[in-house]
Amino acid sequence: MKSWCTPLYEGTFSVGLDKKFFSIPRDGNAAKGALKISLNPFLVVNEKRVILIDTGIGSFGEDTGVERLFENLERHGISDYEVTDIFMSHLHYDHMGGLAHQNSGFWELSFPEAKLWVSKDDWARVMAKEEFYDAEKTEFVAFLDARAKLHFLEAEDQPYPEIRVEHIGGHTQYHQAIWYTDEDLNLLMAGDVIATRGQVNRIFAAKYDYDPEQSKRQRIRLAREAYEVGATILAYHDEECSMFRIVDHDAQRGYVTEPVSGGRP
C-alpha cells in the first residue's frame, strides 16, 4: 500500500489572554484582543503503522471533546484501537489534550494500543511541576504517566526508519521537529515553530515563545531545509492550508508555496 497523510481538522477557536479556547466558525472572527487559532492533528498511515502527530485539545476547550478526533479518524476508516503510534511536537494542552478523556466518568486512554513518543526531557519537566496548568490537567498528565505506553525520545532520535525527530526548542524548551520520509511521503511537522503557512515568509520573534530568537532561527532553517528536500510542511494551526510545500524562492516575494491535498491515494 502507498503511505498517506491527512489533517484532522478539529475546529477554529478564539483564544484570549486567559488561554481559554472558544469555538468559532472557520470563517469567523476572534473576540477583540484574542487570537484566531485552528487545530489540525495529523494522521499518517503506512503499511506497518497508523500514526498521529499531536492529538488536539480534547476536552480542555470550552465545549470540546475527543469525539471530534474519533469522528475524523472514522471518516478515514481508522478506529481508536488501530492507532499504533503518537508523536508529540511539544506538551501544550492544545496539542496533547486528545490523549485521554473522561467520557465514562474516569480517565481513559483515547488510543489504548498506541505507543506515545515524547521528548524525555520535556516529560521530566512536566512531571516535576507541582501543577500542570490546573488541577484537572495535572491529574491528566499523572494518568498518562501511569497508564500510557510512554517511549522517550532523545534530542536527536530515529525510532523508526521513516521517522526522525530533532530537538529544536524555541516555542517550548524541548520542542521537537518531526520528519517523516519514505518512498511516498516527505513530511516536516515543526509544531508551533512553523504553525501556519504564512510563517515561512515572516521573520519574527514571538513574545509567547519560550525562546523567541531560537524559534526565529529554527523557523528560517527548517523552512530552507524543507524547500531543499521538497518536504510537505504540516501546519498545525493553519485555518485554510494545513499541508503545503515550498516550490520556489523569489528575492522580492520570498518563498512561493502551494497547497498539498491529504488523504488516501
Where are these regions (language model features)?
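Short, electropositive alpha-helical surface patch
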Residues: H175, M243-G262
